[in-house]
Regions:
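Short secondary-structure boundary segments
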Residues: 1-6, 80-84
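Glycine-rich nucleotide/cofactor/substrate-binding loop typically near the N-terminus or early
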Residues: 38-110, 118-123, 128
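Short, glycine/charged-enriched secondary-structure capping and boundary segments
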Residues: 27-31, 53-56
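Short glycine/serine/threonine-biased micro-segments
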Residues: 14-16, 96
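Conserved catalytic alpha/beta core of Sir2/sirtuin-type deacylases, generalized to analogous enzyme cores
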Residues: 2-12, 19-29, 35-39, 102-200
């Protein structure tokens, strides 16, 4: 009797955030080879619903994490759609349910990492979603004319003259790498994982 060779699970780490990471994770889930996916998500988003929640509640940015969780979710279509549902009127206008859910979990647990793990359990994700840092950071840029821009959204959607080139970028404060993200990256390198860096 011929022995059936079991396919080796390919382990892939995706580093990025926003729509780009969601698209890559969604595509990889449809890949014919068995995969274990780990998303290491950027934490500098400051626009839209995420920016408002950061300003009002002092939480870490939930939006990019939410997208990665939904991309890896094995929950029902209704639950996945619920997490992406965006309110259209009144005080909650433009907020997504998933962003509010993650904000509430962070306030309850006092730890964004714990909030992400609990949301991952609720959404029954197939893989891992890890914030790259647990520090409350902002992306900053110095322009060629010497002016300083703070906040990712102010860089992406400039209020300044967009023809002025960016001279350098940095994080404020200097971010500490989440130990779980470091562990995943080192394990990936050791095991010969494939790492994909997504420009979000």
């Amino acid at each position: 009797m011929k022995k059936i060779k079991k396919k080796k699970i390919q382990k892939i780490v995706v580093i990025g955030g926003g729509t780009g990471t969601f698209t890559v994770l969604t595509a990889l889930r449809n890949y014919s080879v068995p995969l274990h996916l780990t998303a290491i998500v950027t934490m500098a988003d400051s626009g839209g619903s995420t920016g408002r929640l950061r300003d009002q509640y002092g939480v870490l940015p939930p939006g990019d994490i939410r997208r990665a969780l939904v991309a890896l979710s094995d929950a029902s279509q209704t639950l996945r759609k619920l997490f992406n549902y965006r309110f259209e009127t009144c005080d909650l206008k433009d907020h997504s349910f998933g962003n509010i859910f993650l904000t509430a979990l962070e306030k309850m647990t006092g730890n964004f990492g714990c909030a992400v793990k609990e949301a991952a359990r609720v959404l029954n994700i197939n893989g891992e979603v890890i914030p790259v840092t647990l520090d409350n950071i902002n992306l900053c840029a110095e322009l060629a004319d010497g002016s300083i821009i703070r906040g990712e959204t102010n860089i992406d959607i400039p209020k300044h003259d967009p023809s002025v080139q960016i001279k350098k970028v940095w994080l404020e404060p200097v971010a500490r790498l989440n130990p779980e993200a470091k562990k995943a990256i080192l394990a990936a390198d050791k095991a010969g994982y494939r790492a994909i860096v997504v420009d979000s």
